[in-house]
UniProtKB/Swiss-Prot annotation:
Residues 37-299 form the Phosducin domain. The keyword Chaperone applies. It is found in: Cell projection, Cilium. It comes from Bos taurus. The gene is PDCL. GO terms for biological process: cell projection organization; heterotrimeric G-protein complex assembly; positive regulation of smoothened signaling pathway; regulation of G protein-coupled receptor signaling pathway; visual perception. The modification N-acetylthreonine is found at T2. Gene3D superfamilies: Glutaredoxin (3.40.30.10), Phosducin, domain 2 (1.10.168.10). Keywords: Acetylation, Cell projection, Chaperone, Cilium biogenesis/degradation, Phosphoprotein, Sensory transduction, Vision. Belongs to the phosducin family. The modification Phosphoserine is found at S20, S25, S226, S293, S296. This is Phosducin-like protein. InterPro entries: Phosducin (IPR001200), Phosducin-like_reg (IPR051499), Phosducin_N_dom_sf (IPR023196), Phosducin_thioredoxin-like_dom (IPR024253), Thioredoxin-like_sf (IPR036249). Pfam families: Phosducin. Residues 15-53 are annotated as: Disordered.
């Protein structure tokens, strides 16, 4: 329970004004206001705008803006370099393709000129030493072989042995045949050693050399003497252009009485009296047993 003194003192305290209290209040208000300003202020390095833009104009902001600018500049330069490299590569490829095409056309033109016969033997010898021209040499040889084959087979094809029935037929066969045709005439008589072997060889070679005309005639038909028949048969006469270019009498002296087609072929090739063949000898030439079989008959006209 309060006394009268307390009440009196209390009322005085309520209405009592102290200068120290006012100063304390002012200090508190200032501190409170300073704290509010500090809380509302933004950091020095804060960015409030988009990428590459800073509202901070302080030293750190300027440095960051410069770094970002240099980074963008470097990226742009690298992209330009890559684009330039792609363009250069594309242009180089297109130029190379065009140049390669022109070079190939030039090579083909040179090749055709050389193959057409504009190359001398000296040029051919030089190219044989140059491995880089191997492709040309292969094509050249191939075309030359084809040309020789056409020259060999462009005339008539015979492929059999012709029997000459008379002396007049013998002369006509020599004089009226094409001048480029090679004619081989076997003069024979039955019972002469080596006659049967020669007949079989002629049959085989006629199939192997269709451009060569193989014939046979009895010595009695052309009026040969008995001495010639006994001592010179079997004989082989070779004509070309109406002239006698080969004359082999008593062939058995060189080949023996039992010889084969391959033996006669090698003998004639040794003297250059058979054209070169494009292909190897077929089995029918090498297999003399087939050519000399008793069941096979000569194709005689």
């Amino acid at each position: 329970m309060t006394t009268l003194d307390d009440k009196l003192l209390g009322e005085k305290l309520q209405y009592y004004y102290s200068s120290s209290e006012e100063e304390d209040s002012d200090h508190e208000d200032k501190d409170r206001g300073r704290g509010a300003l500090a809380g509302s202020s933004m950091p020095a390095d804060a960015d409030l705008a988009g990428e590459g833009i800073s509202v901070n104009t302080g030293p750190k902001g300027v440095i960051n803006d410069w770094r970002r600018f240099k980074q963008l500049e470097t990226e742009q330069r690298e992209e330009q370099c890559r684009e330039m490299e792609r363009l250069i590569k594309k242009l180089s490829l297109s130029c190379r393709s065009h140049l390669d095409e022109e070079e190939e056309q030039r090579k083909q033109k040179d090749l055709q000129e050389k193959i057409s016969g504009k190359m001398t033997l000296k040029d051919l010898a030089v190219m044989n030493e140059d491995q880089d021209d191997e492709e040309f040499l292969q094509q050249y040889r191939k075309q030359r072989m084809e040309e020789m084959r056409q020259q060999l087979y462009q005339g008539p094809q015979f492929k059999q042995v012709f029997e000459i029935p008379s002396g007049e037929g013998f002369l006509d066969m020599i004089d009226k045949e094409q001048r480029s045709t090679l004619i081989m005439v076997h003069i024979y008589e039955d019972g002469i050693p080596g006659t049967e072997a020669m007949n079989g060889c002629m049959l085989c070679l006629a199939a192997e050399y269709p451009a060569v005309k193989f014939c046979r005639v009895r010595s009695s038909v052309i009026g040969a003497s008995s001495r010639f028949t006994r001592n010179a048969l079997p004989a082989l006469l070779i004509y070309k252009g109406g002239e006698l270019i080969g004359n082999f009498v008593r062939v058995t002296d060189q080949l023996g009485e039992d010889f084969f087609a391959v033996d006669l072929e090698a003998f004639l090739q040794e003297f250059g009296l058979l054209p070169e063949k494009e292909v190897l000898l077929r089995t029918s030439v090498r297999n003399s047993a087939t050519c000399h079989s008793e069941d096979s008959d000569l194709e005689i006209d």
